[in-house]
């Protein structure tokens, strides 16, 4: 089934792309959530008009992402946890905890965009990548210290 994407969808395409997907995926997920519309002639003509608006929207979201990256990279994250004598944490620091810290500091970031290969289980300083935008990423400096 051919669809025109209304939102960026990871592993599928960008806004305005015409993609071919399984009918069930289209009927049960993309169409009901408003993430895509059917690729008919009428919608294709509307797409041409919408592409100009989409270009503006992409530029605006890219600028917002760059501003967010500047704020993120200026921020120093210090998390305190109980730790054993060898610096091993009781528990771990996850992307959820980092997202909660950012939210407390006025930056709303989805935890899925914070890329941790595995939870942090030792004291120390870490660089944590964040997927802010498909074209722009940031690196957070996370320091885990003993409580």
Swiss-Prot record:
Keyword Ribosomal protein: yes
One GO cellular component, as annotated: ribosome
Keywords: Ribonucleoprotein, Ribosomal protein, RNA-binding, rRNA-binding
BP term (GO), one: translation
GO MF terms, alphabetically ordered: rRNA binding; structural constituent of ribosome
InterPro entries in UniProt: Ribosomal_bL9, Ribosomal_bL9/RNase_H1_N, Ribosomal_bL9_bac/chp, Ribosomal_bL9_C, Ribosomal_bL9_C_sf, Ribosomal_bL9_N, Ribosomal_bL9_N_sf
Function of the protein: Binds to the 23S rRNA.
NCBIfam families recorded: L9
Protein family membership: Belongs to the bacterial ribosomal protein bL9 family.
Protein name, as recorded: Large ribosomal subunit protein bL9
Species of origin: Trichlorobacter lovleyi (strain ATCC BAA-1151 / DSM 17278 / SZ)
